[in-house]
Amino acid sequence: MYGDEWPLRVTGIASAAESEWRIGQQTPERTCEGWLLVYVKSGMVEELCDTHRVLLRAGQILFHQPAELFAMRAVGEVPPEVFRVEFTADGSAMDSFRSCHMRLGNAEKSCLRQLAETVREVFQPVQDACQMPARRAEIPFGGKELQTIYLAQLLYLLARRRQRTRKQSPPCPRRAGAGSPCGKRAPVLCAEH
């Protein structure tokens, strides 16, 4: 399927943060410079993805692609805990993450935990959940490299799962409908709608 020597390569992590949001708190609309991974650890958030909104629940991940308009709002009754990573990546496998959201499995959650641990070593904690943090002045040996490795591992696992799911599942009947909850989203979630 992928003819590239490197079908997926993480080229940098601009910033990353894990923070708890107050209900109703939201980010201003802006355009992604690179890719943006959003993972909801607890609670719920509503993500703006260009012209439509996606409700993410605990255990779900979403990717905003470069040049996509995005914003996030904390919704529900439980203050959500959200992990966000702004990164750059290339390779043909990254196409599978365009308009993608899905629930994580155990292997992917394990990678995400390792990534979150190294993010805490590399980036300063944020006071305001809407802000992305600055890098720490002193980073433990290999911290930047390990976070890149863990992110790449997570992306490879997700790309493989999406590839398997597409081969095994019939297309979502609502996928063709422009106003459907599935829209152009990952067929992985169609069964949950």
PLM-predicted stretches and their roles:
Residues L104, V126-E192:
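Short, Lys/Arg-enriched, Trp-marked, Pro/Gly-tolerant hinge/linker segments that flank
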Residues F70, F83, S96-R98:
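N-terminal helical cap/lid subdomain that shapes the substrate entry/recognition surface
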Residues V82, F87, L112, A116-V119, ...:
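Hydrophobic alpha-helical core bundles mediating ligand binding, dimerization, or RNAP-core interactions
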Residues S42, E77, E117, R175-A178:
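ATP/adenylate-binding site constellation spanning eukaryotic-like Ser/Thr protein kinases
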Residues F97-V126:
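Aromatic/histidine-rich interaction motifs
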Residues F63, E77-M94:
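A short hydrophobic beta-strand segment most commonly corresponding to one strand
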Residues M1-I61, A67-E68, V75-G76, L112, ...:
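Generic protein-terminus/edge-of-domain signal
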